[in-house]
């Protein structure tokens, strides 16, 4: 049986609608009928066919890794799922036999394979993944929100790396993940949550999500904002979401002594750092990759169920046949999360 899918067919700019074989269910797998998918920044990198994509992405391949769907097939060894379960899933498929996997730290698996990056993705009518990777979506969480659990998980993992209660938090980079991290920080009890960027559209989105201050660093100095907020000692926690060297160096300068930084944004490999700031301030820097399995996922569901409102971050919906419009708007930078409807 042939099914509709969005694939990287050629080693050049673009993503194409195509027909592929329906995936085959293995003994330990679930077959998921896709309802909604969201376009990730990674998918835009793959579309643009940048240097990272050229080194990483096999062609041809179905792409995508943010989704919600319904279980329509269950492998014979699988327990704990039923036909009709609504699920999203962890996009990092782990080996199960390295030291970290065996120690329960699966998010640190050294042999991780990415759905829609190293193997067939979710931008298709059906997806097969190991049942271990699936996460049941509670009934009181919408399909829209469930479809962005993957990037929301990046935000939650990054934001909850350190205690935020009563702390002043700086977030550099107001992409969707940065904005969601800011909303999480506010929700769990941070005092001042300041987010920086140069994209006014996205800073506006951050304001709708309740940040203390959204600062356009092309127009306003971070130091001035700190004075206005009555901050005398610097930020306690930094969440670096941009991969921008000047943003990171600005963060180092404005951190308080003993401050803690979580790094999710991917900088250029040759980024220079003022290590004096790190050493003499006694800063702690933690790298973040993916989501903790599955602690982050349970936290995501709980945060939404306890009143965290992420709906403003979803700015555009398109039918899957209009996927090109979705990619165009994502590439323009004038969007939050863009959802493609497969039903």
Swiss-Prot record:
NAD(+) binds at residues 177, 197, 202, 264-266, 288-289. One of its GO terms (molecular function) is zinc ion binding. It catalyses: L-threonine + NAD(+) = (2S)-2-amino-3-oxobutanoate + NADH + H(+). SMART domains: PKS_ER. The record marks 150 as: Important for catalytic activity for the proton relay mechanism but does not participate directly in the coordination of zinc atom. Zn(2+) 2 binds at residues 95, 98, 101, 109. Catalyzes the NAD(+)-dependent oxidation of L-threonine to 2-amino-3-ketobutyrate. Homotetramer. This is L-threonine 3-dehydrogenase. It comes from Vibrio vulnificus (strain YJ016).
